[in-house]
A protein has these predicted regions:
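C-terminal and inter-domain tail/linker signature
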Residues: 1-128
Length: 128
């Protein structure tokens, strides 16, 4: 794979870990462009919106942890397939996270699609 795409995947994985697992906005903001645009309807735009989201996690889901199962990169986009747990011992959620990097290689835009992991499934394939 192209070295630039691998760098993009690593960069976004580090950013994601700082947000969700470490809940460290001060370090995460260095990965963000100033125009950071959020498409999750529950989170505000700009770096300040992400800071508020991290504070929400610290207060309401301090044990939240996510594992990146796989990642993909194409051009300025990085996609993560994630197993997210708000609390230990739960089934959690399957999440697709999409990030777009700006001309300086910083995270500039974010989308996500979130699906609860059900207790039972119509097939044996699992979500990951």
């Amino acid at each position: 794979m192209d070295a630039a795409l691998e760098r993009n995947k690593q960069f976004v994985a580090e950013f994601y870990d700082l947000i969700i697992n470490q809940k460290d906005f001060e370090r995460a903001k260095k990965y963000m462009g100033p125009r950071y645009k959020q498409h999750n309807p529950l989170v505000k735009d700009r770096p300040e919106g992400l800071r508020e989201f991290i504070e929400f996690l610290k207060t309401n889901a301090p044990e939240a942890h996510s594992e990146i199962i796989r990642s993909f990169a194409e051009g300025d986009y990085v996609i993560l397939h994630v197993h997210s747990l708000r609390q230990p011992g739960t089934r959690g959620r399957a999440i697709i996270e999409i990030f777009r990097l700006d001309e300086n290689g910083l995270v500039d835009e974010h989308w996500d699609v979130i699906q609860e992991i059900p207790e039972t499934s119509a097939n044996p394939n699992g979500m990951f």
